[in-house]
Each structure stands twice: as C-alpha cells, then as structure tokens.
C-alpha cells in the first residue's frame, strides 16, 4: 500500500491534522443537511419537482413507440514520430417496434491516423472525430425509425457535444443532423450521466430562491444530490425537476452559453431537466432538442411523456439507466488495453522489413 510507503513522521502529522479536519467537516455536513432540507421545502412550494405519472393505457402506447440509441468511444495511442492512431467505436441500438429485450445492434470500428504535437491536441481531435461518427450513426438510426407518427433517439451525452467546440462547420452539420430527425418525427434526447457546472444553481439565483453566493452549495451536483434525495423520500417515487431552457441557467461568464448561441441562431432550442430515479441512484440530466416554440404547459407535457418512456418503459427494475443507453455504451467501448494491442499490431507490420526497428528504438528512448 502507498500509505505504508509514506514516511512515518509525515504520516503521524497528517493523521492528527485529519482528525481535526474531520471534526470540522462533520459540522459542515450537518449544516448542509439542514440547509438542503430548508431549500427543499422552498422548492417544493414552487412546484420545482415532478413525479413521473402515466396510466396503464399511456404506458402500453409508449411501449410500442420505435426507439434507438447511439453512443461512441475512443482511445488514442502511439505518438512516436508525431503520429497517433485513434481507435473509435460507434454503436447503434434499434428497436423498430418498441420495447424489446433483444434490439438490433450495429457496431462500427474506425482506425484513424492523426498527426499532432501532444496528447492534449490529439484528445480534442479524437473527440471531434468520434462525434462525427456519432452524427452519421444518428442519421442511420433515423432512416430506420423515421416516417411514423412518433419515435425517439437517445444520445449517450449532451445535445451540444463537445460543449465548448464552436467550429462553424461542425455546428452546422450537427444542427442539420438534429433537424433531419425532427423532419422525420423523431425526438432526440440527450442522456447526460455526468452533471457538471452550476446551471440549476444559476437559475435559482436568478429567481432569487437562493441569494448570491452560497457557501454550502458550490455546483449543481452538490445542490441536487441532497435536495432531490429529500424529494424522493417525500414522494416515494422517481422525481425530475421543472424543465428549463438552456439559456435560463447560463451566465455571461459561461463559455457554454456562447456555443449554445451558435446552435440557437440556427433554430435549435434545448430544454433540460435533472432526474433522480431512486434514493440511492445517481442524478442525470435529460436534454431535449426542439425546432419549434412550445408553451410552458406543452413543454411540461412533453417531458412527462419523455420521462415516462425512459423510466417506466425502458429502465429495468434495479437499474437507473435506460436499457438502450446501457447496451450502446457497452457495445461501443474501446478499452485501453485493446487499443494498445491493435496499435502493437499496426507497428509490428510497419516495422517488419529493413532496419526501421532501429530507428524506432532510438526514438522510443527519448520518450522514456
């Protein structure tokens, strides 16, 4: 253990200081628990939390709605001589006749060589390549599901992805892909697993529900984890928050607001809610892409339908994510060890003739 390798004098000093820090943290957590319950009461009185409500007849109809899911992953390996290889996996999950435990699954693998100065640059390039692959997959799924009265495509991630990538051509292509789905009567839903930032906190400040900076709640995850836990205990059912327009949680300092403006200028509106399926479950952000203006009541009705589809139709008992999202994530996952083995195969073939391996060995020493 790393703990045992640390110098004993240093460990002794740190342990005593940790005991004092723990006492202070205990008091802070007590205050957070108290403040979160007070805030829950304030939010509850303003109808911020909603239960997922659908009768049997509605659920039977939802089960028959076609649905697909798309996800992608990547690994970048190499770097010798400035050449990297990006391994990309893209998965499509398609249920053309509605709910099923055996949907159609299509998986595409891509190997793309890229030249870059360092890992930071290659990561950004790789992420964009993966997203372009996902856009192509969304169109393929839309071609299978579109043309009917109503269908859905779930994206494992946000609608605007990458959130800070403001390339005009890329934004145009992504908006066109989402608009194509819209013309085919397909609702595109972003299922975001990592809640980041302080958009909901900003909204509460704007509505003066929370005043100014708050020492107890720093970001949305801290705030919602405690408050939505109380909401679930109170209602004994999954809950989600009042749907917000993307702009309602942005500030002038928020870089994502600048990216969203590029999408909105092209006609795209995004609404989102925070969703907690169980007391011990994680918090997710559910995003909805729109190319029309709806009233507040219409937005609420749309989200109740979306949440019913996700939670009551496609989320199995004991799980907190919809089945298509789970399948797509697992099927597209390019694991690090697999990417390194494939890269080894590429280099083995590349260096099979002549004295190229001598050059490689000399170059490798400079990376050690």
Predicted features and spans:
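Two-metal-ion RNase H-like nuclease active-site motif
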Residues: 65-75
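Short loop/turn segments at secondary-structure transitions that flank enzyme active sites
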Residues: 73-76, 93-96, 159-161, 194-197
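Long, contiguous domain-sized segments
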Residues: 1-60, 65, 123-152, 157-368
């Amino acid at each position: 253990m790393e703990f045992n390798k640390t110098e004993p004098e240093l460990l002794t000093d740190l342990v005593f200081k940790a005991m004092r820090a723990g006492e202070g943290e205990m008091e802070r957590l007590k205050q957070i628990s108290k403040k979160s319950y007070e805030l829950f009461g304030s939010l509850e009185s303003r109808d911020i939390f909603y239960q997922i409500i659908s009768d049997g007849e509605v659920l039977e109809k939802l089960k028959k709605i076609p649905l697909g899911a798309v996800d992608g992953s990547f690994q970048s390996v190499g770097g010798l001589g400035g050449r990297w290889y990006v391994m990309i996996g893209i998965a499509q999950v398609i249920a053309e006749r509605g709910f099923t435990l055996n949907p159609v699954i299509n998986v595409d693998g891509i190997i793309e060589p890229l030249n870059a100065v360092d890992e930071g640059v290659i990561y950004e390039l790789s992420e964009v390549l993966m997203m372009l692959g996902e856009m192509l997959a969304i169109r393929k799924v839309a071609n299978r599901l579109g043309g009917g009265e109503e269908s859905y495509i779930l994206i494992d991630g946000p609608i605007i992805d990458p959130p800070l990538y403001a390339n005009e051509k890329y934004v145009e292509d992504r908006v066109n892909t989402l608009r194509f789905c819209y013309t085919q009567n397909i609702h595109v839903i972003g299922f975001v697993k990592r809640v980041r930032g302080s958009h909901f906190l900003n909204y509460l400040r704007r509505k003066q529900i929370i005043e100014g900076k708050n020492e107890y709640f720093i970001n949305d995850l801290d705030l919602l984890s405690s408050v939505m836990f109380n909401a679930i205990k109170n209602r004994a059912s999954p809950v989600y928050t009042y749907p917000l327009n993307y702009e309602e949680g942005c500030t002038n300092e928020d870089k994502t607001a600048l990216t969203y403006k590029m999408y909105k200028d092209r006609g795209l509106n995004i609404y989102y809610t925070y969703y907690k399926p169980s007391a011990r479950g994680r918090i997710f952000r559910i995003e909805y892409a729109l190319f029309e203006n709806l009233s507040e009541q219409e937005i609420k009705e749309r989200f109740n339908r979306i949440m019913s589809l996700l939670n009551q139709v496609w989320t199995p008992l004991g799980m907190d994510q919809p089945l298509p999202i789970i399948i797509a994530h697992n099927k597209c996952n390019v694991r690090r060890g697999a990417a390194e083995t494939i890269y080894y195969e590429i280099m083995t073939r590349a260096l099979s003739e002549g004295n190229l391996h001598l050059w490689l060995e000399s170059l490798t020493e400079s990376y050690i």
